[in-house]
Every structure is written in C-alpha cells, then in structure tokens.
C-alpha cells in the first residue's frame, strides 16, 4: 500500500525550495510503517519522495494507524513520541523536528513559518482596542495578527467576584483530582497552576463563559464556533506560580494544536479573561504576531532569525483573543507571579465528531506533568 499522500495543491514551489535548503544538513528521513517504507529527501528546489526506499539519515518506525494520524494532522510527532507510538532507529527527535514543518506543508498545505514572509498589512501588533471598535475592525486585527488585546471588557467588581470564586475552587483542589494541574516548586512543594472544567463547578464562572461580551469576541472570525465546557478541559483558569518550577506552569513556545488535532481543532479561538493584570513580573503572554495558520520548528529560536515577538501586558478586566495555532508562550514570571487568566475557547463543530468528554490529550496526561514537562 502506498504511504506517501498526494502533495497538497496549495504548495508554493518557492516556499518549498527555501524549506528544502534548510534541510540540507539534516538529510533524508525514512518512515518504516509496518512492512512499507517511504523516504523524503531534500532535493533543492523541491523534496523528493521515494516509496520503498529506506536509506534516510534518520529512520522512524511507527504503525500504520500512527502514520495515518500524522499525515492527516490528527496527532503530531511530539504526541506520537510522548505516547511511545514512534521509535527512532537512526537519528532522533531533533531531525524529526527539522522535517516536521515541511511534512505538514507537503501533507496538508500548512506552510512553514518564515519571518521574511510576515506581512502585517500596515497594522500595529501592539495595538489595544476597546469594545467601542466595530466588529470589522476587531476581526481585521485578529485575522492579520492572530491575536487581539481588548481593554476594560469587564469591571473591577466583576473580576473581584470571579477571583473569589477561583479562590474557592483553588481551596478545594488536590493533586491527582483530575480537575487541576500542579507543579513542584524550588522548595519541593506542590503548587496549583491550573484549574480545568471550572464552569461545570461554578455558576459564577459559567456566567462569564456565556457572557455576550465573550461570545462577541470569540465569534469574530467564524460565527459557527461553539463552546465546549465538558471537553478539551473546558474553561480553565491559569495561575502563575513564581520562581523555578517543575511542570507546566511556565509553558514554552507552542501552538495549541502542538500535540495534535489541527485538522479538527483549528482555527479555534481562545478568549483570555484577565482576572488579574499581567506583565513580565507576574507572568504575561508572549506571541509571534502573524504566525497562525503556519507550521513552525519546535525549537524555532535556535534556527530562525528576525522573528517578531510581542509581549501582551494587561490590566484586570482586559481580554486577550488568540487563534489557537498562533505561536505563543507563557514564560516564567520575573517577579512575584500571581497572574490569573480564565481561558474560554470556541471550537469548530468538527470537534464533537472526534473528541468526547475526557478524551483530549490533556485529559490523558494531566497527572503525568513531569513527562510532558521534559519537552521544555
């Protein structure tokens, strides 16, 4: 049975040539899938695909089901690696990471991110808006940048009530309760860093989730998107823990579909309700403007130059909006930490065809944070 899927019709020869040149030092990669083999070779100005050939500098073995998931953008190679559903017979993780953006382009037409192609259409990545702006202006900024900062969406009183409810849920949380994420502090203590499925346990937070202001912003790009309070961790609250921690309080550069599901999750839109303000000292959001809808190297900081980065500092009651495949990070606070953000996400209807309650990747690894954290 043939392994190599047809090349996506959206492939631009110039983009593929530039990507192939970057793979020169990495060399060819072979996939052994049950009894079949396929090898991808950087052959500037393109990539050569050879069925039955197994002489790549990197050799990856996986099952047919895993290969199909990779090609169809249901699971990423990182997901397969963590799940031990792929093994390296030659080469390793770094070589697979080098090939990953190119394979996504060939298989699904998702172009490799290149800062030289960044086009902000004259817009300012640092712009802040209010709800007085019309939907067309807000949508245009979100479409170009992949993120949006809207000030003073909620009042201080509304945020005080929400924070009191977060205090209540935090007091009830325990490691291993399957409704929270925890990290280990420098002193060896466990510290709460995320509450999940919060609106199933709080009418106060459920009201925020369903607030017309949240819906307006979440549906700017696609009015058919839907809330998913009972799956994908529902609406979650991030709590930034200060200092060096082991676990997933400080999340490195990533796309929210980085573990898989791009074909069914994207373009989801995530609303960040700023329960507290955020800045570098408390732990803020960093983004690569205009990186959404593209594939980026897992360690892009080591292999790409000139990548624009924006820090999104906020006040209590502000809202951030980001397309889920935007490249973004939640770095370690430089000071006291303490940022609280409630994330409410709107998904395409295809989600309900594939992922039920408790079936998302995070549901499966929530209590295995040390394993996931080794990718930082």
Model features per residue range: what roles?
Residues 120-144, 152-251, 374:
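Non-heme Fe(II)-dependent double-stranded beta-helix
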Residues 87-88, 149, 321, 343:
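Hydrophobic beta-strand signal
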Residues 67-68, 258-259, 325-329:
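Histidine-centered metal-chelating micro-motifs
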Residues 314-328:
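Conserved metal-binding segment of the jelly-roll/cupin
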Residues 326-376:
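Non-heme Fe(II)/2-oxoglutarate
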Residues 216-222, 244-313, 351-359:
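Catalytic core of non-heme Fe(II) oxygenases with the double-stranded beta-helix
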Residues 1-133:
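Feature captures hydrophobic
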């Amino acid at each position: 049975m043939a392994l190599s899927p047809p090349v996506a019709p959206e492939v631009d020869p110039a983009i593929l040539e530039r990507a192939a040149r970057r793979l020169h030092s990495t060399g060819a990669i072979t996939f052994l899938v049950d009894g079949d083999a396929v090898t991808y070779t950087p052959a500037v100005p393109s990539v050569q695909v050879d069925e039955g050939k197994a002489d790549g500098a990197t050799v990856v073995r996986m099952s047919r089901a895993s290969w199909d998931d990779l090609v169809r953008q249901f699971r990423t190679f990182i997901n397969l690696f963590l799940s031990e559903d792929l093994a390296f017979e030659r080469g390793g993780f770094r070589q697979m990471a080098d090939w990953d953006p190119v394979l996504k382009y060939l298989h699904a037409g998702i172009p490799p991110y290149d800062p030289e192609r960044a086009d902000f259409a004259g817009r300012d990545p640092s712009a802040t808006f209010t709800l007085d702006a019309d939907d067309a202006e807000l949508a245009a900024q979100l479409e170009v940048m992949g993120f949006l900062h809207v000030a003073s969406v909620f009042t201080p009183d509304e945020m005080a009530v929400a924070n009191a409810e977060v205090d209540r849920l935090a007091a009830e949380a325990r490691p291993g309760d399957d409704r929270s994420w925890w990290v280990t502090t420098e002193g060896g203590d466990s510290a709460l860093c995320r509450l999940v499925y919060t609106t199933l346990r709080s009418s106060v937070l459920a009201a925020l989730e369903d607030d017309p202001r949240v819906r307006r912003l979440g549906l700017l790009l696609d009015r058919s998107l839907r809330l998913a309070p009972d799956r994908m961790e529902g609406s979650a609250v991030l709590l930034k823990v200060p200092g060096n921690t082991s676990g997933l309080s400080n999340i490195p550069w990533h796309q929210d579909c980085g573990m898989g599901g791009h074909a069914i999750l994207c373009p989801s839109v995530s609303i960040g309700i700023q329960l507290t303000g955020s800045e570098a000292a408390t732990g803020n959001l960093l983004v690569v403007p205009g990186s959404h809808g593209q594939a980026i190297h897992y360690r892009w900081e080591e292999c790409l130059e000139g990548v624009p980065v924006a820090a999104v500092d906020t006040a209590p009651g502000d809202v951030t909006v980001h397309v889920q495949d935007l490249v973004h990070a939640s770095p370690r606070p430089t000071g006291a930490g303490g940022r609280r953000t409630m994330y409410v996400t709107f998904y395409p209807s295809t989600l309900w065809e594939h992922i039920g309650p408790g079936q998302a990747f995070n549901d499966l690894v929530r209590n295995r944070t040390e394993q996931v954290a080794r990718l930082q």
